[in-house]
């Protein structure tokens, strides 16, 4: 039977998936006699804007056209045709049911309260307008394919209590770029991020033990992944593969690499599948600050890597380096005064056997412990240059560490306060004097030669955008000055 009008007759007790509604129905009235509604009952009612339940119904209720159970502890159906772009789930709700938001097009943001503990299968499936979701730490279970084909979803943060997610949670989220996984996650489910074609980077937590079949299949722009040493299971096609529909076979990405530690499951998987493996090394300071880098390249001291030490010290107001830190006029949080900014500042450096400061030639991964008394998820890490300008390192909090990449060690500040950052980099202005001339090329050459005691803006110096500062940057600046058709700041 196909229902085209808006009312269900009194006496009907069950609305199941076999009771087909017209695709263009906009309003449905549910009588008091209904005692059971199937999760898929309204699945394809893409124009539906309102569900109204008789107030005398003992099992169900509605509010603002949205269907709940009588106690309003479960949200059962948010009609797909509602035009609102934002929705706040009521704080009485503990469960978002299977298919609850399925097919919603206009919705861009859903605010999930701490009362929610369970999110059902396909709860947000094919919500094509949804852009950003934060799963609160109260959530302990999620069904399969929760965000299946959310093609506008760009950012997501998972609850710390999600340890073993079900399959295909983010499958076909083709615009997903930023993911913060649970710090306690043990498994990555089958097809969890498959066909997330815009995903370029993801930090896997140290607690991870298993990556299941095809977890990152068809992630076209994911070129490298670092696999934690605790991973003991990696199933078929988990990394580095795509499914070729023409030939109906799995194929490897030619340019994919796996980073990990010697003797690990990551190395075993890479070698078994003919994928390039990059062995990682690490160093640590007495402050608990760690760096990870490739053992294969010369980013840390080349052949003298073992003689390079990582050092750090926490700065205080009496330190000369601290004098450049001034928050005046640089705070985005209107309720925070400069003198009230809570922060921890480190001077981080690499030293050779002669005690001279050296810099890595490639980007390395840095892990700074979350300071005592700080909320890791609220922390930001800023690089502070010689002129006191702040650059947000876009650190990710995982397992009690703030993790980011850099090719330069200097002053780094950890705070929960939002600070205004450098909005524009003048590529080529290596010495920071506001103009681009041969003196900038000289500064870069001095830096490459290992000289110290001068100011250099390493971000502005990387004019060929390859993530490092070397003589090629100096040459490009000289070409620009000579009138060659080159663009600074691009490869």
Locate predicted features.
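Structural signature of tandem-repeat unit edges
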Residues: 4-14, 22-36, 45-95, 104-118, ...
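Surface-exposed loop/edge segments in extracytoplasmic proteins
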Residues: 388-394
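Cellulosome-associated attachment modules in secreted, modular CAZymes
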Residues: 417-491
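Generic recognition of long tandem-repeat/solenoid scaffolds
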Residues: 4-5, 74-77, 165-166, 188, ...
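Feature for mature exported/ectodomain regions
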Residues: 281-379, 385, 415-423
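C-terminal beta-strand-rich structural cap/linker in extracellular carbohydrate-active enzymes
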Residues: 403-421
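Consensus positions within tandem repeat domains that build extended binding/scaffold surfaces
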Residues: 17-19, 39-41, 76, 98-100, ...
């Amino acid at each position: 039977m196909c229902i085209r009008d808006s009312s269900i007759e009194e006496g009907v007790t069950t609305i199941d998936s076999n009771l087909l509604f017209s695709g263009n129905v906009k309003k449905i009235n549910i009588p008091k006699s209904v005692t059971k509604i199937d999760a898929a009952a309204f699945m394809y009612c893409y124009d539906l804007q309102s569900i109204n339940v008789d107030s005398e119904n003992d099992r169900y209720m509605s509010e603002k056209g949205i269907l709940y159970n009588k106690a309003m502890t479960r949200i059962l159906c948010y009609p797909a045709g509602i035009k609102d772009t934002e929705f706040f789930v009521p704080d009485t709700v503990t469960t978002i049911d299977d298919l609850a938001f399925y097919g919603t097009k206009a919705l861009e943001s859903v605010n999930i309260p701490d009362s929610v503990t369970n999110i059902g299968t396909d709860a947000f499936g094919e919500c094509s307008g949804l852009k950003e979701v934060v799963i609160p730490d109260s959530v302990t279970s999620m069904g399969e394919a929760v965000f299946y084909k959310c093609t506008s979803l760009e950012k997501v943060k998972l609850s710390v209590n999600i340890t073993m997610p079900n399959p295909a949670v983010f499958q076909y989220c083709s615009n997903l770029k930023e993911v913060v996984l649970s710090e306690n996650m043990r498994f990555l489910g089958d097809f969890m991020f498959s066909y997330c074609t815009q995903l370029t980077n993801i930090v896997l937590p140290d607690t991870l033990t298993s990556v299941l079949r095809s977890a990152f299949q068809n992630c076209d722009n994911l070129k490298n992944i670092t696999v934690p040493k605790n991973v003991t299971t990696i199933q078929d096609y988990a990394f580095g593969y795509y499914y070729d529909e023409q030939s109906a076979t799995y194929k490897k990405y030619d340019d994919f690499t796996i980073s990990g530690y010697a003797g690990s499951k990551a190395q075993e998987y890479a070698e078994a599948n003919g994928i390039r493996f990059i062995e990682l090394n690490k160093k640590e300071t007495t402050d608990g600050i760690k760096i990870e880098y490739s053992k294969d390249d010369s980013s840390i001291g080349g052949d003298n890597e073992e003689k390079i030490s990582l050092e750090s010290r926490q700065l205080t107001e009496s330190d000369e380096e601290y004098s450049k830190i001034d928050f005046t006029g640089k705070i985005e949080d209107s309720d925070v005064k400069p003198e009230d900014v809570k922060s921890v500042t480190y001077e981080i450096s690499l030293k050779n056997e002669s005690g001279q400061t050296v810099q890595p030639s490639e980007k390395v991964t840095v892990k700074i412990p979350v300071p005592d008394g700080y909320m890791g998820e609220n922390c930001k890490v800023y690089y502070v240059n010689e002129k006191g300008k702040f650059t947000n390192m876009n650190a990710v909090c995982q397992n009690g560490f703030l993790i980011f990449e850099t090719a330069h060690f200097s002053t780094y500040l950890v705070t929960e306060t939002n600070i205004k950052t450098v909005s524009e980099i003048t590529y080529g202005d290596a010495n920071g004097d506001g103009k681009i001339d041969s003196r900038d090329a000289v500064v870069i050459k001095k830096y490459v030669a290992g000289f110290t005691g001068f100011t250099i803006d390493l971000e502005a110096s990387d004019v060929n955008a390859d993530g490092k500062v070397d003589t090629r940057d100096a040459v490009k600046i000289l070409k620009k000055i000579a009138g060659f058709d080159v663009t600074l700041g691009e490869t």
